[in-house]
């Protein structure tokens, strides 16, 4: 009987041997592998490129939305110039001058980008709701703004991953400052929704451009440290 | 027993295990993840293929893990994408991280894990086919073409640039098998040219993102190209028709003129155009016949206006034997004359023997006799005057001077060297007034010319023979138009090749026929055919006896010979106011001595002194006995 049991176990083992190898072993990732690749993670360069591309897209779409809104709701030029000083993200410790940007480290670049992104998620949602209340808001404008808000969230995720990869930092808690930027940044004279929305759009456009610039600078620094500006 | 039972059990176990795979319940087999696809880079779906379920109801579950995170999530949506699929929506899809996906099959007896798969969403994008593919037929200057337009799949966000798609379309005729592929890039419209008139086309479009897979082909669009006529084709048809007509007309014209063309392109080879030349004779090889056939019957011309002024009497010229023989063969009328004379000719080289006085005399007599015969025979060819001249000649012969070397030639006999003849001096005492000096001269000239123009032709001589009947007769002056005695002095010398005869001066004035038989013929001129035109001279040397004597000098000229240029050299004898030289035969002439220098006179007396230099044939022979000596040559100039 002992032999029989041993034989049985052996037979079972033989029959079930493929299952023993069920757990996969992660293989080394290669850059060029396509579908069903066995790479455990996306490489850093690839990730950075994607983030930059993402940021570019967001900027482009925001620019289109802004110009669309301008043409429709802000006909007079003098009104367009008023929004320059009312951006809600003024208070953020984001470098704004070229000198500052050149001196800042990679880490701070990334953190700045992340701050920007995170600070705009909420306002965009607000903007979306505001635009929905319009009577004559064009469909395209609404779609664009909606798209932008969605992509912004995605961008945030990407930047987080990027930070984790580049800086080997742990998962940063997405700290949405609920300080009510809107409440702080809204000028009293900007109660008019149109102007408010317009301000939001244009400010966001600027910040999106800033994000894109930071990321590109970061990339440039990755390849050639001393020639970037 | 126990051993056998164990063995049996083992065998049974093996059988069961073998059976288990097909029929008995068992844990499920390992499933396999077939593919994961994202249509717009915002969501994606994964499909798996389950293994055998082991006979028991088996459930499958998909678990995924995000990159560098140990948290295992289960598929949020098993139903949206259909059977054995897992759908990841927008919130669950991140382009920043890779996904590690595993499918697990579970049944009552166990579990089965599929091989895990790493997914990068960006690289698994396979868009939907393009939508709203429209094909229209458009026209471009009469040539139709297809315009294909489409839209990207509605899910792909190409507007914002989230996905960049490139398109490709394919076209084929309905009856064809192979497709024609066209890459359209990022544009959403494409033109297709070079269509077949009346053909039915099938068009399909597909797209692909930057990194990803080609989509499926869109649904086929059908289009029929309307029939159109090639404008170019009609032009070509017109051109072809016109050119065919033109070509046919040209061919017809060529056909009508083919003979002319043949003459133009391939001109016929000219044959020999010698009058009387018979090719057949040449082929037969009888040269004699050929040459005889070439004899021009009417040559020298019987009448010539140039000679009308002359009254010519007979001239007798000796001819060489061989020539006589040839002459015999000639078909002319003169042949009869020739033949009659053949016996009397002596054609040895030393013609001088013939020319000796005695011989001449003898010959003259014979000739005279023969002449009579020939006269009779040739009567049709002679005028009465000629006959009379001949009679006179006979008389003259009787009175031949010793000092006179005269060669009397019987009629019909021409004495010639190759193409040279010298007329015999005639002594004629009979008045020759009535002789037609012109006629004589004519005859002389004619015969001369005959010799001259056809050197070596005996026929010529034969021709001349008849004319050369030196039948000067002074007795028949009336026969001659100008009543001038014809003084003819012809020196016929066998040794002398004299192509022309110098002036023959007819002694002026009547002479006693018995004593002065010299007749002078004046060479009127030589025409371009080397014809010596003789004119009986009636002039100052008419003294009967003086013509042949030195005193006649001024009017005489002696044929001295012929120079190398075939020029008849005449020696002017003596002088006289009348500067017509005449050829005189002096018996006392020494060979080679010119009594007088020839007076080259370019002026012509109206009486018709003609100096001619006539080309003489090649042979030169010195004369003997005072005949014209080639050694001393005096050239005469034509008037």
UniProtKB/Swiss-Prot annotation, chain A:
Cystine connections: 29-39, 87-203, 220-228
Domain of life of the organism encoding this protein: Eukaryota
GO terms for biological process, alphabetical: animal organ development; growth hormone receptor signaling pathway; positive regulation of growth; positive regulation of receptor signaling pathway via JAK-STAT; response to nutrient levels
Keywords: Disulfide bond, Glycoprotein, Hormone, Secreted, Signal
GO molecular function: growth hormone activity; growth hormone receptor binding
Keyword Disulfide bond: yes
PROSITE patterns reported in the protein's UniProt record: SOMATOTROPIN_1, SOMATOTROPIN_2
Main location: secreted
Stored InterPro entries: 4_helix_cytokine-like_core, Somatotropin/Prolactin, Somatotropin_CS
Cellular component, GO annotation: extracellular space
Localization in the cell: Secreted
Glycosylation sites: 143, 175
Keyword Metal-binding: no
Signal sequence annotation: 1-24
One Pfam entry name: Hormone_1
Gene3D superfamilies: 1.20.1250.10
Protein family according to the UniProt entry: Belongs to the somatotropin/prolactin family.
Protein name: Somatolactin
Species in which this protein is naturally found: Cyclopterus lumpus
């Amino acid at each position: 009987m002992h032999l029989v049991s041993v034989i049985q176990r052996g037979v079972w083992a033989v029959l079930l041997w493929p299952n023993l190898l069920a757990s996969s072993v992660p293989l080394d990732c290669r850059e060029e592998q396509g579908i069903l690749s066995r790479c455990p993670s996306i490489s850093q360069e690839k990730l950075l490129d994607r983030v930059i591309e993402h940021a570019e897209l967001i900027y482009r779409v925001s620019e289109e939305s802004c110009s669309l809104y301008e043409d429709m709701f802000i006909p007079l030029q003098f009104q367009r110039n008023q929004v320059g000083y009312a951006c809600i993200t003024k208070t953020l410790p984001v470098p704004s001058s070229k000198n500052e940007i050149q001196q800042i480290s990679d880490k701070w670049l990334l953190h700045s980008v992340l701050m920007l992104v995170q600070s705009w998620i909420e306002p965009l949602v607000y903007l979306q709701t505001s635009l929905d209340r319009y009577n004559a808001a064009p469909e395209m404008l609404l779609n664009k703004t909606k798209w932008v808000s969605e992509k912004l969230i995605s961008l945030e995720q990407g930047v987080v991953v990027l930070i984790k990869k580049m800086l080997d930092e742990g998962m940063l808690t997405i700290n949405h400052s609920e300080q009510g930027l809107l409440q702080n940044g809204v000028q009293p004279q900007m109660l008019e929704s149109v102007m408010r929305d317009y301000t939001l759009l244009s400010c966001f456009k600027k910040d999106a451009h800033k994000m894109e610039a930071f990321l590109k600078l970061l990339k440039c620094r990755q390849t050639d440290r001393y020639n970037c500006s | 027993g126990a051993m056998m039972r164990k063995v049996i059990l083992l065998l049974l176990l093996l059988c069961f295990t073998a059976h288990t795979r097909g029929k008995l319940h068992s844990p499920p087999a390992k499933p396999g993840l077939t593919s994961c696809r994202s249509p717009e880079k915002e969501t994606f779906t994964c499909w798996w293929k389950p293994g055998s379920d082991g006979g028991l109801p088996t459930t499958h579950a998909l678990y995924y893990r995000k990159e560098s995170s140990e948290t295992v999530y289960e598929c949020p949506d098993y139903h949206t994408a259909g059977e054995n699929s897992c759908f990841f929506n927008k919130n669950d899809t991140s382009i920043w991280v890779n996904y590690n996906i595993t499918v697990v099959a579970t049944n009552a007896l166990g579990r089965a894990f599929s091989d895990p798969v790493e997914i990068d969403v960006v690289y698994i994008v396979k868009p939907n086919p393009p939508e709203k593919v429209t094909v229209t037929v458009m026209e471009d200057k009469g040539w139709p073409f297809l315009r294909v337009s489409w839209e990207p799949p509605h899910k792909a966000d190409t507007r914002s640039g989230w996905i960049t798609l490139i398109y490709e379309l394919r076209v084929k005729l309905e009856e064809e098998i192979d497709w024609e592929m066209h890459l359209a890039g990022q544009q959403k419209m494409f033109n297709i040219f070079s269509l077949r008139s009346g053909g039915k086309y099938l068009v399909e479009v597909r797209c692909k993102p930057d990194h990803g897979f080609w989509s499926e082909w869109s649904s086929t669009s059908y289009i029929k190209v309307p029939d159109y006529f090639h404008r170019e084709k009609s032009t070509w048809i017109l051109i072809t028709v016109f050119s065919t007509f033109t070509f046919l007309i040209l061919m017809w014209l060529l056909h009508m003129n083919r003979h002319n063309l043949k003459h133009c392109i391939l001109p016929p080879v000219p044959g020999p155009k010698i009058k009387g030349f018979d090719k057949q004779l040449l082929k037969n090889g009888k040269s004699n016949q050929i040459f005889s056939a070439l004899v021009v019957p009417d040559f020298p011309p019987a009448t010539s206006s140039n000679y009308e002024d002359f009254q010519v009497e007979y001239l007798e010229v000796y001819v060489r034997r061989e020539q006589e023989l040839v002459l015999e063969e000639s078909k002319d009328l003169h042949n009869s004359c020739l033949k009659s004379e053949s016996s009397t000719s002596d054609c040895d080289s030393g013609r001088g023997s013939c020319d000796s006085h005695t011989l001449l005399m003898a010959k003259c007599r014979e000739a005279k006799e023969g002449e009579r015969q020939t006269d009779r025979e040739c009567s049709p060819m002679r005028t009465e005057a000629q006959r009379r001249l001949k009679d006179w000649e006979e008389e003259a012969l009787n009175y031949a001077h010793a000092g006179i070397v005269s060669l009397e030639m019987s009629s019909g006999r021409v004495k010639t060297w190759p193409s040279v003849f010298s007329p015999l001096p005639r002594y004629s005492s009979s008045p020759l007034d009535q002789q037609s000096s012109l006629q004589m001269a004519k005859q002389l000239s004619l015969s001369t010319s005959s010799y001259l123009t056809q050197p070596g032709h005996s026929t010529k001589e034969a021709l001349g023979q008849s004319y050369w009947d030196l039948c000067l007769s002074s007795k028949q002056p009336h026969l001659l138009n100008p009543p001038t005695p014809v003084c003819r002095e012809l020196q016929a010398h066998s040794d002398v090749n004299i192509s022309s005869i110098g002036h023959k001066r007819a002694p002026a004035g009547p002479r006693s026929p018995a004593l002065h038989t010299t007749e002078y013929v004046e060479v009127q001129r030589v025409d371009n055919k080397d014809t010596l035109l003789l004119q009986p001279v009636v002039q100052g040397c008419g003294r009967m006896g003086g013509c042949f004597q030195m005193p006649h000098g001024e009017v005489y000229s002696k044929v001295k010979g012929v120079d190398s240029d075939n020029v008849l050299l005449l020696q002017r004898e003596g002088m006289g106011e009348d500067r017509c030289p005449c050829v005189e035969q002096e018996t006392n002439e020494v060979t080679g001595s010119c009594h007088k220098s020839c007076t080259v006179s370019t002026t012509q007396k109206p009486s018709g002194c003609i100096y001619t230099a006539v080309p003489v044939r090649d042979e030169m022979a010195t004369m003997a006995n005072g005949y014209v000596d080639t050694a001393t040559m005096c050239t005469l100039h034509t008037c």
